[in-house]
Each structure stands twice: as structure tokens, then as C-alpha cells.
């Protein structure tokens, strides 16, 4: 969870022909005061691409723009333990954040602290950090095992093997296969039910005609 990944890595990864997108996120837990109580927040940075993807999960408010009146606009993520809403303010040690939007989902694990999402520039201004804790990579061809191995080697060599490399492609393939198999079973079941219903109707008509 430490911010140790140089942003140059994102540029190097995006330069590879097999890579569709590469993007990083910074992370920092911060003490904060909000809704009249002392607590903490999990501050996470998004770049432009991630904010574009977040639009579909926006359930209220807008995406963050530039800071106004000395306050930094941020998003938060809806959760049963997070009661922050649009318009709420979060007071840090020497800065104030304003919630301008709420997401109904995020790729982060739920914690006891509210997830607060800001721009990379805001993150840098608030924490002084500009390295990433996580870099995500999307491939143009998810079956390109050679490309995956090349990326793995690049990251391991660059970071002196001090990196956790997680390949979610195989897991996503299994999820997708399970999804289609489930749909196939459901549709087959519906077809059988429809066939039985039609046969019952035909039998009822035949019995009615025979009774006459």
C-alpha cells in the first residue's frame, strides 16, 4: 500500500504495443474531522481515465473540478459505514475537502474509514506525494501470454523484484465462462418450461374437442 511506483512506469507500460491502458492510483490514510466527529479517511487519487469510468457509478452530484474558495472537491463511495453525502465537508489538518459526488461502487475493499477520491493534482497538494501505490494495466488482447510475461519482467526488473504482480485475466475468464454457462442453463430451463406449457395447452384443446 505504499506509494513507491514511479509515474514513469505508466508511460513505459503504455508505450508497449500490447497495452491498451495503464493507470495508477495513490493512497494515503489521513486523520480528518467530518460530520462533527474525529476520524480518518482513505484518500485515493484518480486520473482522467478513471474519472471517466466513474461516471457510470455516480449516483449523486458531479465529478470533481478545480478547487474553489480554498476547498478541494472530492468524491466518496456509498457504503453502510459511510454517511458522507454531497455538500459535506471534511477538515484535514491544513486543508478542507468538499464532497461533490457519491459513487455507488468502487474497486476498493470496504474499510471503517470513508473512501475519498480526488484528482492526482489535489492528492499531490494535500500529501506532497506523487508516486503510485498501484498500477493497473489493460491489454488489447487478454490472451497474449507473451505480453503478460514481458510486462511482468519489466516491472520486476525496474523495481528490483519488490513488486506484487497480480494477473486477474484468468479469474475474469472464469467469471465470464461461469456467467455464460449459467445463462445457458437458465435459457434451457425456460425453453423446457415453455415446451411443457405448449404441450399442456395442446392437450387441453384436444381434450376439449374430444369432450364435445
Spans of features found by a protein language model:
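A short beta-strand structural signal in non-transmembrane regions
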Residues: 129-154
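Peri-transmembrane interface segments
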Residues: 150-152, 158-198, 207-212
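Structural beta->alpha junctions
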Residues: 102-106, 137-144, 168-172
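Short beta-strand boundary microenvironments
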Residues: 2-134
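Short conserved AdoMet
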Residues: 14-17, 156, 160
Amino acid at each position: 500500500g505504499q506509494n513507491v511506483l514511479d509515474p514513469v512506469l505508466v508511460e513505459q507500460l503504455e508505450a508497449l504495443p500490447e497495452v491498451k491502458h495503464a493507470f495508477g492510483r495513490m493512497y494515503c490514510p489521513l486523520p480528518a474531522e467530518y460530520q462533527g466527529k474525529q476520524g480518518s479517511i482513505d484518500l485515493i487519487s484518480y486520473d482522467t481515465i478513471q474519472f471517466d469510468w466513474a461516471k457510470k457509478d455516480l449516483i449523486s452530484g458531479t465529478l470533481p473540478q478545480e478547487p474553489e474558495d480554498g476547498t478541494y472537491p472530492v468524491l466518496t463511495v456509498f457504503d453502510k459505514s459511510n454517511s458522507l453525502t454531497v455538500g459535506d465537508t471534511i477538515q484535514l489538518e491544513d486543508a478542507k475537502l468538499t464532497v461533490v459526488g457519491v459513487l455507488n461502487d468502487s474497486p476498493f475493499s470496504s474499510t471503517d474509514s470513508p473512501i475519498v477520491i480526488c484528482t492526482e493534482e489535489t492528492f499531490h497538494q494535500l500529501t506532497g506525494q506523487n508516486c503510485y501505490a498501484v498500477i493497473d494495466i489493460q491489454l488489447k488482447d487478454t490472451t497474449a501470454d507473451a505480453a503478460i510475461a514481458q510486462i511482468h519482467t519489466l516491472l520486476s526488473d525496474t523495481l528490483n523484484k519488490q513488486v506484487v504482480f497480480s494477473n486477474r485475466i484468468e479469474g475474469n475468464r472464469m467469471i465470464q465462462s461461469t456467467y455464460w454457462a449459467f445463462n445457458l442453463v437458465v435459457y434451457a430451463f425456460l425453453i423446457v418450461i415453455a415446451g411443457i406449457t405448449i404441450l399442456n395447452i395442446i392437450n387441453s384443446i384436444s381434450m376439449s374437442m374430444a369432450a364435445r
